[in-house]
Amino acid sequence: MKKSQVLAVAGATLLASGVLAACSNTSSNNAKLAKDYQYVYQTDPETLDYIVSNIDSTSFVTTNAVDGLLANDKYGNLVPSIAESWTVSKDGLTYTYKIRKDAKWVTAEGEEYAPVTAKDFVTGLKHAVDGKSKGLSIVSSSIKGLEAYIKGETSDFSTVGVKALDDQTLEYTLNQPETFWNDKTTSGVLMPVNEEFLTSKGEGFGAPTDANSILYNGPFVLKSVTPKSSIEMAKNDAYWDKENVKIENVKFTFWDGKDQDVIAKGFSDGQYSKARIFPTSSTYEKYAADFKDNIYFNEPGAGVATVSLNYGRTTYNHTAKTSDAQKTSTQKALLNKEFRQALNFAVDRNSYSAQTNGTDGAAVAIRN
């Protein structure tokens, strides 16, 4: 059984849910899914304005449609994207990026609109402030003069530390050295936008169901968004790195999340390129047997679950233990180290995790 090609799609996934990574039994479906990526989505985008919005339903669509200065490879390393190279001043305050000459903006129809230039990144940051981007906190204290502009202490955007020295040269000036600055360039708040196009669209820029409400400089262009139905994308033939884009078409079909077996069944029938399966589902054992060599667990997330103990409790509004004797004994217990350790050791993390992630996924979901 062949494995389908999988497109890296930004978006949240639930902890340690099994993912099937095989293709259907039919050779015709194998051939189709080798060029097309098909999966599901659950939330319609509220906007396509990738600079102002930082919610998953937007980035789910635009991450593969709009490129920034740098990108992360499959190992998480930063690699050139719209910026083909960059330099850092000795004091760590000035970052200068060279914009590649073959980067282009195209419409949803794939028609070339304009080259991507350094000015587009300046326009993008100004649009982030004008639109009160949710991501401004990522860079507001980093870029020289930006915080003052945001607060209205100056109305002159030229005082902000982002400059287009020429069409191919972009410069950021920071308030203090940040060894992690380049990581921030992958954030939506620092993405580019063409000023002429932005002005022409006005308040219609980023309209959620209009593929023509934004321009594209990434590997894919959006073809359509049909609420509660589908999101479709196609390969951008004008993309600067198109030789490394192996997927021709992308289609996400709306899934309301009610029937957990719909995706796995669609995968088995060749409808989807991959499938998320649920270890707690009644059909998990069947799919685990059918696809045992092609089941992968997601990496555990960064979330932390804690239990806090109140050593100095003064109110007892939400407990039946309200007598002075009960309060005293409770306080003594909480101040006892061995008692607190006993509470910790009494929690079976594996069993707790298995309630959500099943027996197979329980241990995978726990980091420590």
What residue ranges belong to the model's regions?
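Bacterial Sec-dependent N-terminal signal peptides
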Residues: 1-8
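C-terminal motif of bacterial Sec signal peptides marking the signal peptidase cleavage site
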Residues: 19-22
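Bacterial signal peptide processing site
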Residues: 24-26
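Extracytoplasmic/periplasmic ligand-capture domains
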Residues: 74, 101-110, 115-131, 221-356
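Surface-exposed binding/hinge segments that line
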Residues: 120, 127-197
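Gly/Pro-rich hinge or "lid" segments in bacterial periplasmic/extracellular proteins
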Residues: 157, 168, 174-251
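Structural transition elements
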Residues: 361-368
